[in-house]
Amino acid sequence: MAEKKTDKVKRLTELSHCAGCAAKLRASDLAQVLGGLKSTKGPQALVGFSTNDDAAVYRLAPGMAVVETVDFFPPVVDDPFQFGAIAAANALSDIYAMGARPLFALNLVCFPDELPLKVLSKILAGGQSKADEAGIPILGGHSIRDPEPKFGMAVTGVVHPKKVLTNAGAKPGDVLFLTKPLGSGIATTAIKRGVASKQLAKRALGVMTTLNRAAGEVFASGKFKVNALTDVTGYGLLGHLLEMMTAAKARATLDLERIPLIAEVPALAEDGVVPGGTKSNLAHVHKKVRFPEGLPECIQWVLADAQTNGGLLASVPARQALKALKALEAAGVDAALIGEVQAGKPGIDVVG
């Protein structure tokens, strides 16, 4: 059968209503919906949706728990291979964010009739490349026809029940590490609008296609204490950090000068190149975040920017910060110490 083609669609991002993890439901909407659901969590279920963590964890035996996550989204870039790679890396990130090891994955595909099938083949090949890099097989999947292409994975992992790293254990006296620069949401919006420089597109692509495996393995190594761990994705640094502080009943201070940013992103934000999801993120957290007086709104947007396969955010006891930093550096992870955890009403203070 001949492939169906179109001369009208030249770019994958033309078919997406928003890019990557910015396509998530607004945090406020999700909270409203989940708030009406009763948790059926039993004694074997170690992590559910009550703390908005990155994956579900279910104990199978005294020394083994299964970790399950699912993640998919519309195109963030026009190259189908790179789109597949980004989506797969993003799905795998949730496993690493739980201190777990991935075992296998299933593909999730939504694909329009009018695109050539070779596009889908390239998307799947991109996903396979990241599964290969993670050392896991893809054992199957599910596909449906959809006017908007989407791709992602359901990933299954494993961890010792006593070594699960959740987003709920941060303690006053901890310091906060971030393993990737912020700004991929704004960068992909610039790509979608055709206003991104080649340098920005290359840098953002490098961030989004880099697995969080190395950082995840360091945090799970047991070489130093990790009180809480999550990945920074669709709700931005502020949103995911606020989830961490809410669970810990503590308050975070962020040092603006230490937070790594993708070059060109602040200028783009100042020009209004900001995804709707990022603006929703800022609106959701604004009442619980204190910014320095006069801080431009464009910088606030960057801190709330919806990330696609963003870095890991870890809460580590201050006395072990140097040990953690050295271990991350040895693994080739360019981590930044961006703030600290203090006693206080759940929220975030941005300083600097």
UniProtKB/Swiss-Prot annotation:
Manner of cofactor binding, per the entry note: Binds 1 Mg(2+) ion per monomer.
Annotated positions for site Important for catalytic activity: K24
One Pfam family, short name: AIRS
Enzyme active site: C21
Transmembrane stretches, start-end: none
Binding annotation for Mg(2+): D54, D94, D231
GO CC terms: cytoplasm
EC number from the UniProt entry: 2.7.9.3
Protein name: Selenide, water dikinase
Source species of the chain: Myxococcus xanthus (strain DK1622)
